[in-house]
Amino acid sequence: MSGDKKSRSVIYKKTSRDKAVSVYLGKRDYVDHIESVDPVDGVVFVDPDLLKGKKVYVTLTCAFRYGNEDIDVIGLTFRKDLFFARTQVYPPVEDVKCLTKVQERLMKKLGNNAYPFVMAFPDYLPCSVSLQPALSDVNKACGVDFEVKAFSASNLEDRYHKKNSVRLLIRKIQYAPDQPGPTPRAETSWQFFMSDKPLHLTASLAKEVFYHGETITVAVTVTNSSEKTVKKISTSVEQTANVVLYSSDFYTKTVAFDESDEKVSPKSTYKHTFTLLPLLAYNREKREIALDGKLKHEDTNLASSTLLKEGIDRTVMGILVDYKIKVTLTVSGLLGDMTSSEVSTELPFILMHPKPDSGAKESEQEEDFVFEDFARDQLKDELQPEEKEEEEEDEK
């Protein structure tokens, strides 16, 4: 057994059916740092003999899917492109400046027919997010996804064929901020009819940012100076997905819940710490819950909170996700349960993944490349209708 402990770096590769074009990417997840976004940097390898004088282009697309693309309603597809960019890679029209180490090593390994490309995201695009479909809607999609495509054509006016193109799904993601905001705390008072003094509710969290899979504790204090009895206290994590396309729709779903049936009598004080754990595992049957975008055959989690660059309009098209803790008191009325009322307060918080250790890769030059092919069946569900027809013809 070899004693070589050299680390390995995965390179994602996909080749067109006609073998003329191959795309190499060093990663599939591109990080939105709020102030800037990682560019999509890769390498295209071409076979000039198979291209027969054709040019090679690379495109970057952000699309909003909101239905089953197999169905075409009066000529309308269930897809809207939010962003599209294109560049000619071969023959190169301009040199790519400041190549990454991965690009440099790939070009050295692949030889003279390797050409680098860099494409940038604008700062207003949403991250990769989808809405969980109902169990009966397996083939339907609603969400934002990103795609890198390379294709060969004599010119841009010509319609290229599926066999001359390569499509790779990527993700745009965000990580938890380095400097979280102040600790969330909220309080409210409620004056009841025929009570001289109010009911006071205070709720607080230990911090603003929680990671996926982390338990959230909510400290609740009820100071009941009124003549009413608090019959129940409940806490919940509510996810709000703002879906902005042709209109602005809000989907609010409860993704975690805890309650106490202990009564708070008049002229008394009650303190309790509630525990909440928002996980997709507990919500797989709930429709329209927002999830982080996923690549085929991979699991995902509840969608991360959306962080926007200062000055960016929140009506940007896509799906924006927010979380809050809602604390609700159920208070008895004059006629008992028939006239119960509720007192509530809310605590906004952030739910995200932690930022990976930036020092994990110090010597990229010492790494071996491991090439991982993008499986063609991974993208089969994502093909547009006309492309599916072409693929079926190619397979005959």
Swiss-Prot record:
Any one annotated GO CC term: photoreceptor outer segment
Keyword match Lyase: no
GO MF annotation: an example: G protein-coupled receptor binding
InterPro entries noted in UniProt: Arrestin, Arrestin-like_C, Arrestin-like_N, Arrestin_C-like, Arrestin_CS, Arrestin_N, Ig_E-set
GO BP terms in the entry: G protein-coupled receptor internalization; signal transduction; visual perception
Keyword Membrane: no
Family matches, as PROSITE patterns: ARRESTINS
Domain of life: Eukaryota
Family: Belongs to the arrestin family.
General remark: Arrestin binds calcium.
Protein's UniProt name: S-arrestin
Biological source species: Aquarana catesbeiana
